[in-house]
Structures are given as structure tokens and as C-alpha cells.
């Protein structure tokens, strides 16, 4: 996954003051943008070492393996970095859907509220409520 | 560009504590992710009213029309919002290239430093140094 030919230097990602970098998850095949999330260094390192997308949840303040609850894992084929080295793309194979709402992509609505995305599952079936 | 059919409600974007929202500029045709930048409310409003991508520069602390210096404008066809309403996609027609380095996309390198993108112009020719 990370071939080195000796002529290139690993890019050092610039994490922000909270230690995070925004990550765009993009479907490797359809090129749809699936989600925007954040990663800390540990999440990027785990993504590289395991080949599966890891993020850092800002609301739960914890490292997060995408799909750990739903099973909707993201297999990461490549990591791209932008010119400023402060934003990242994970090029992924997405199992089922990226969004917890059941849509394939989190970006399933236009600004006017109309729906442009495709729903892949019923979240009530996937994220079981505790009884 | 923003048809309303009466059954949908305009989404209210959640700007962060700095008044910004991350914006992914995606090529409408190739679906390449071109750049990740930030917008404040004024930038989103101007994008909607003019049809051209506007952002807010965090380094220069000012509103910024993409291409105002280089001429590499982004005509915005659609604005998508994510499930949490705190991230946005501009679906654009990109003139020439998005990146100030001359590459079509700002995400022209892999994490290992190898180049995957295509260079479209020489930045020294486009961003003239003052003499």
C-alpha cells in the first residue's frame, strides 16, 4: 500500500490545534464523496497499519473505527494529502453505506432540503436500541 | 438552481465557533475532489447568489472568491449538505485547475509523497510576481 522508491519523502500531516485533520472519505469506484470526518495522528496511523478507516469523534472524544458498530467498514486503498498538508482523502471501498441515516453518502441532501442520495438500509435495523 | 416545491425546508448550515463550515469542492463531471476550504455564511450566500464559489480564507482572514486572482473560477451547480449539517459540497465546473501549485486538484500527492495528480499550469505564469 505504501511503496517507497527512495525518491519521495513521506508527507507530514499538519494537525490543527486540537490535533485533528479533516478527512474526506471518497468512494474509490464511484468517486462519490461519502463523508467528512476528522482524524488524529493515531487514527491516521491505525488506518495505515490496518487498511481500514479510523477517525476521531469530536462529539464522543474518542478514536473510532468506521463501521465498528454497524459493520459498514471502509477499506482504504489510498490516502491523499492536499497542497497545504492539512486535509486528507481516504479513497475507500465502502461496505453498504457510509451514513448512519442509511444513505450511501452523508451528503444526501441539497441545501434546499431536497434529497439527492440513495438510501441503503434502515438505521433502526442496524443500530439496535438496547432493550 | 434552487427550486422549491413547497415540501422541503432550506437546511440551516451549522457554522463552527469561528463561524466557518468546511467545504469540499468536487468536480461535477469527473467527480474528482478538487480542494477542501472553508466558508462563512457570507461566502455561502454569495456562492448561492452569484453561482460562483466563494470561501473564507483562514490565513488571510477575508472573504475570497475562488479564481479572483488566477481566473480559475468555479461555477457552482449544486450545494450538498451532510447529515450533521456541518459540512458542505460545492459541485463545480472548475476552470483550468483548482490548486495554486498548478495541479488540477489540491490532492495531487499520496501520503508517501508520490504524485498522483495532473499539472495544468505553471504558477509562476499565473500568479505574477510584482516587479
UniProtKB/Swiss-Prot annotation, chains A, B:
Keyword Acyltransferase: no
Cofactor section: Mg(2+); Zn(2+)
Main location: cytoplasm
Species per Swiss-Prot/TrEMBL record: Methanospirillum hungatei JF-1 (strain ATCC 27890 / DSM 864 / NBRC 100397 / JF-1)
Entry protein name: Phosphoribosyl-AMP cyclohydrolase
A GO molecular-function annotation: zinc ion binding
Keywords from the named record: Amino-acid biosynthesis, Cytoplasm, Histidine biosynthesis, Hydrolase, Magnesium, Metal-binding, Zinc
Family to which this protein belongs: Belongs to the PRA-CH family.
Binding site for Zn(2+): 83, 99, 106
Binding of Mg(2+), residues: 82, 84, 86
Alphabetical list of Gene3D superfamilies matching this protein: 4.10.80.70, Phosphoribosyl-AMP cyclohydrolase
Amino acid at each position: 500500500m505504501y511503496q517507497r522508491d527512495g525518491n519521495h519523502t513521506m508527507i507530514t500531516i499538519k494537525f490543527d490545534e486540537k490535533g485533528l485533520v479533516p478527512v474526506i472519505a471518497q468512494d474509490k469506484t464511484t468517486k462519490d464523496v461519502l463523508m467528512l470526518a476528522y482524524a488524529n495522528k493515531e487514527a491516521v496511523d491505525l488506518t495505515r497499519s490496518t487498511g481500514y478507516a479510523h477517525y476521531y469523534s469530536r462529539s464522543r472524544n474518542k478514536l473510532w473505527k468506521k463501521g465498528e458498530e454497524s459493520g459498514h467498514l471502509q477499506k482504504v486503498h489510498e490516502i491523499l494529502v492536499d497542497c497545504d498538508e492539512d486535509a486528507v482523502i481516504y479513497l475507500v471501498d465502502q461496505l453498504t453505506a457510509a451514513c448512519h441515516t442509511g444513505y450511501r453518502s452523508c451528503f444526501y441532501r441539497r441545501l434546499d432540503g431536497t434529497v439527492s442520495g440513495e438510501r441503503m438500509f434502515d438505521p433502526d435495523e442496524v443500530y439496535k436500541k438496547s432493550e
